[in-house]
Structures are given as C-alpha cells and as structure tokens.
Curated annotation (Swiss-Prot):
The keyword Transferase belongs to this UniProt entry's keyword annotation: yes
GO BP terms, alphabetized: protein ubiquitination; SREBP signaling pathway
Gene Ontology cellular component terms for the protein in this record: Dsc E3 ubiquitin ligase complex; Golgi membrane
Enzyme Commission code(s) on record: 2.3.2.27
Reaction catalysis annotation: S-ubiquitinyl-[E2 ubiquitin-conjugating enzyme]-L-cysteine + [acceptor protein]-L-lysine = [E2 ubiquitin-conjugating enzyme]-L-cysteine + N(6)-ubiquitinyl-[acceptor protein]-L-lysine
Broad class of the protein's primary localization: Golgi
Record gene name: dsc2
Lineage start: Eukaryota, Fungi, Dikarya, Ascomycota, Taphrinomycotina
Regions that span the bilayer: 26-46, 54-74, 95-115, 126-146, 160-180
Species whose genome carries this gene: Schizosaccharomyces pombe (strain 972 / ATCC 24843)
Extent of Polar residues compositional bias: 249-268, 286-305
Name by which UniProt lists this protein: DSC E3 ubiquitin ligase complex subunit 2
Domain called UBA: residue spans: 332-368
EC top class, as a word: transferase
Top-level taxonomic group: Eukaryota
Length: 372
C-alpha cells in the first residue's frame, strides 16, 4: 500500500504510521526477528529478566492479517489528524504508545494471575490503534446514513469488521490490549489522565510534515531567454547539402528564369500564362481590399508561427534563419492566396513561409495541384 498516493500531503503522521507498521512487520518477518517481540511472563520476565521486551513489543505484528486490519483502520481514521492537527495528533500517538508500553503488561500480568489462561502478550500496536479509534468515533462526524430493517447504519460501520478481527485475533491477549486502548483513549479525551496537555517538541514533527518536491523534467519554459537554446548544435546539416540549398534558393528567387530548360514550349507558355493571370488577380484583389478595408500593418511571425526555442528550430529547418525576410508574413497576403487558390489558411501560410511572395506562393500551390 503506497501511502504517498492515498493519503493527502497534509497528513504526515498518518503516513508515518502506515509506513512504520507495514515496514517493521515485513522486516521482522524477512529476518526472522518475530520471536524477539512478544512477552512471556514466566519465561522472559521472571526467568531471564528480558525487560527490554517491554520497549519493543508494540513495534510489529506477527501475521499479515493483523497488519492489513491495522492499516485499514488507520487509513479510515485519517481525519483524526486533520481535526486535531498534526502536532497534537503526533503528541497523542507518542503519549498513547508510551502509556500502552507499561499499562498492558501490568494488566495482562494481573489477569494471568487471576484466570491462568494468558501465557504471553501478543505483539503489535493494538493499544494505540484503538485509542485512535475512540477519537475517530467521537470527534469525526458521520456523513452517510442508511436504514436497513429499522436499523440505522453510518459510514463508520465499515470499521466494525476489522475492529472485531483485530481485537479477537489472539484472545484474550489482543482483546485486553484493545479494551485498554479504547479506555485510555476515552480518558485522554476527557482529560482524566495526567499530562494530556503535553506536546511533542515541534522539531521532531517537522521532518514528517516537510513536503517532498519531485521534478519530472527540468524547470524550463518558452518564457525564459531563448538565447540559451541553439538548435544548430542538435541538428547539424551535412556539408554536401550547402550547394543544393543555394541552388534551391536561387530557384525560389528567380522561378521563371530557372525553369527547366527541357520543358516543352507549350508547358512554358502555360506556366507564364498562369503566373500572369495570378498576378492580375492578386492586384485586383488588393485594390478591392484597400477600398473596402484600411491597410493592415505587418504582423509579426509570432501570430502564425511558433515562438521561443521552437521558433529557432523552425527557422533552421525551413531556411528562414538564412532569409529573415521570410518571417514577416502579411495577413492580406494570406487572404490573397486563400482567395486565388481556394485553399486552407495553413496551406497558404506554408506556401508564403517558403517565399513570402504571393506570385511564387500561387505558383508553388499550382505545382502541388499539378503533381496530384
């Protein structure tokens, strides 16, 4: 069970309890340390004087069923920490842990003298868990009420089964431990125990409450200085492409003079006719735009093209870094190409970004249409 995801970040003590109970029980089972945590009165205390077991018996559970029930109860009672506050809740847990360390062995020893059916104390923080349970039932309000066969149930009814399972897992040892924990939790709430106003020093609570910062990527954004990003170091063009790129630029600047010499006269005449008609159409459209609408100023490339490091990468790949004039695309040029070719805005921008000339953009779109 990952407490980092299921418990809110402001409930650090609940997280600590979940991790401590589960981890200590698993470690004790893996390294075969379970025999060092229970208390046998006649063998450990009276014969071998192993009084150090009184300090350790609450740290682990013997089996996974008790671990699961304890974790379920602590998780469902997590609102106790939110209502009491993490500092007070941590002080309450330490107070009850120390109190249960001595109260349960004393009462269990007296019970064994009277009834002769209690040989050892079952290990586990059952005393602390039932003390927390009393606070949960008393201070946390119910939110769901269900009536079944004239019996009213609340959302706290889900705690009954793990409570019974944990209290009767090793009767009578666990039952005595649970009963004493519930009773001492009630006495603490009613301020019938000495030292209920004691608080744990805050320096011991801060480590459990300090937030954990996790970065899944470096904190970089486009709003920072774009000069720190150099796309040419990421994409180095082969040296053999320089001559080909220069030749392509010359063809873009002089589309008619650099036409293929092997074209037939009919194809060259058709090309010239298309260019002339597109120029006339563009000129007439500009005249209508100037009459009906005021002239539009040049818009920066940031309105239609990427910005920041992405813009630098786009400039290098598209050749705009070699020809800065391609970065200024006018809105009326986009509308002109769209009207002439009846194409989408993205296609018009793509054609203009290669030449920034309406005539050449129309020619490029015509060539693309002829290829299809």
């Amino acid at each position: 069970m990952s407490s980092a995801n299921i418990v809110p970040s402001n409930m650090g003590i609940t997280k600590f309890l979940l991790l401590t109970i589960s981890t200590s029980s698993v470690v004790a089972g893996v390294f075969a340390l379970k025999p060092f945590f229970h208390i046998n009165f006649g063998l450990h205390l009276l014969s071998h004087y192993q009084y150090w077991r009184i300090l350790l018996w609450q740290f682990i559970y013997w089996n996974s069923t008790e671990v699961f029930q304890a974790l379920f109860i602590i998780y469902q009672a997590r609102d106790v920490e939110r209502l009491l506050g993490s500092h007070r809740f941590a002080s309450f847990c330490v107070y009850m842990f120390i109190l249960g360390m001595f109260v349960t062995p004393i009462f269990s020893f007296l019970y064994s003298l009277l009834f002769k059916n209690l040989d050892y104390i079952q290990p586990g923080p059952t005393f602390l868990i039932f003390a927390i349970l009393y606070q949960y039932y008393y201070i946390v309000p119910s939110t769901v009420f269900v009536r079944l066969f004239n019996i009213k149930f609340t959302d706290k009814f889900q705690m009954v089964i793990p409570m019974i399972g944990l209290a009767f897992s090793h009767f009578p040892s666990t039952f005595i431990n649970a009963f004493l924990g519930w009773t001492m939790g009630m006495f603490y709430h009613l301020s019938l125990l000495p030292g209920t106003s004691w608080r744990l020093p805050i320096r011991f609570v801060k480590p459990a409450l300090s937030p954990t910062h996790v970065f899944i990527r470096p904190p970089y954004s486009d709003m920072q200085n774009a000069s720190t990003f150099n796309p040419e170091t990421l994409f180095a063009l082969p040296t053999g492409l320089d001559a080909e790129r220069t030749e392509n630029e010359n063809q873009v600047e002089n589309p008619v003079s650099n036409a293929d010499a092997n074209d037939s006269p009919t194809r060259q005449n058709a090309r010239a006719t298309a260019i002339a008609s597109s120029s006339n159409t563009a000129a007439s459209f500009r005249n209508r735009q100037q009459i009906s609408h005021p002239p539009l100023g040049r818009t920066s490339s940031s309105s239609v093209l990427p910005t920041g490091p992405a813009s630098q990468l786009y400039d290098m790949l598209s050749g705009r870094s070699e020809r800065p004039e391609l970065g200024n695309i006018r809105e009326e040029d986009i509308n002109t190409v769209q009207t002439i070719m009846q194409t989408s805005r993205a296609q018009a921008i793509q054609a203009l970004s290669q030449t920034n000339d309406v005539q050449r953009a129309v020619e490029l779109l015509l060539e693309q249409t002829a290829d299809y």
